[in-house]
Regions:
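Low-complexity, intrinsically disordered segments exposed to solvent
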Residues: 1-83, 123-125
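Acidic, serine/threonine-rich low-complexity disordered tracts
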Residues: 59-171
Length: 171
């Protein structure tokens, strides 16, 4: 597998592409895609103005999420040693939609569900070498908890996902 991304000077990944070997299974492709997107989400977006230790800034970005397409991340610079920065982050998904509309897999009529609850949160502390392609140390954690209700049947569905992404330098 080859994962390629273009990161702008502020740290935001602007383009992400994946290339899989010809014999790769769909499951392997999906796993690499999930990991690549997680790494992309874990990058630190720095402000364009100069900052110092103790600085806090907030970044709002759009994501591929039909219920809560906006993510708001607040960062804090906790240490800076030359080109190496340690940054804490906290992420949330404000203002989720009241309904989720999804196409049917067979191309038939779509499905609309009421969103009973939708909570997305994340936090972490990363060590970022400003000369490196990705963080060189640290961990981020994220959690998603959702509950949907079919308005026709009253059937309730829940979804829970927890993930942790750790970075470390290997010598």
């Amino acid at each position: 597998f080859t994962v390629t991304w273009t990161r702008s000077a502020d740290g935001i990944i602007r383009e992400l592409s994946l290339a899989a070997p010809a014999g790769a299974t769909d499951a392997a492709r999906a796993g690499v895609e999930i990991t690549a997107n997680a790494i992309s989400d874990a990058t630190v977006a720095f402000p364009t103005e100069e900052i110092g230790v103790g600085a806090r800034w907030t970044v709002t970005r759009q994501v591929d999420d039909a219920v809560a397409p906006t993510r708001v991340t607040t960062y804090e610079l906790v240490d800076l040693d030359g080109d190496v920065a340690t940054v804490r982050s906290r992420t949330e998904a404000p203002d989720p939609q009241d309904t989720l509309t999804a196409p049917a897999p067979d191309g038939g009529p779509g499905v609309t569900l009421d969103v009973e609850s939708y909570d997305v949160s994340g936090s972490g502390e990363l060590t970022v070498d400003l000369r490196a392609a990705m963080p060189v140390g640290g961990t981020t954690e994220s959690s998603t908890r959702t509950a949907y209700v079919d308005p026709d049947s009253g059937r309730r569905s829940t979804y829970e996902e927890d993930s942790e992404l750790s970075f470390r330098t290997v010598d």
